[in-house]
């Protein structure tokens, strides 16, 4: 099950893999697909339609 902090903004159409974490103030936009065990750091931005594989880390404010 993905873990999303309350202050993060994840679009309803985004897909988050098992074990993925989205931290405070991060954004994951429409149609984005994140694999398993990914980390989206504080304040990071994942744009519309972006695809990330498994075990990826997007650093804070990236």
Placement of each model-derived feature along the sequence:
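Left-handed beta-helix
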Residues: 5-6, 11-12, 17-18, 23-24, ...
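Glycine-rich adenosyl-nucleotide cofactor-binding module
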Residues: 1-2
């Amino acid at each position: 099950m993905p873990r999303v902090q309350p202050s993060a903004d994840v679009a309803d159409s985004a897909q988050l893999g098992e074990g993925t974490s989205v931290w405070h103030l991060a954004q994951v936009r429409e149609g984005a697909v994140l694999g398993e065990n990914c980390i989206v750091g504080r304040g990071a931005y994942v744009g519309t339609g972006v695809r990330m594989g498994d075990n990826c880390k997007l650093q804070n404010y990236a």
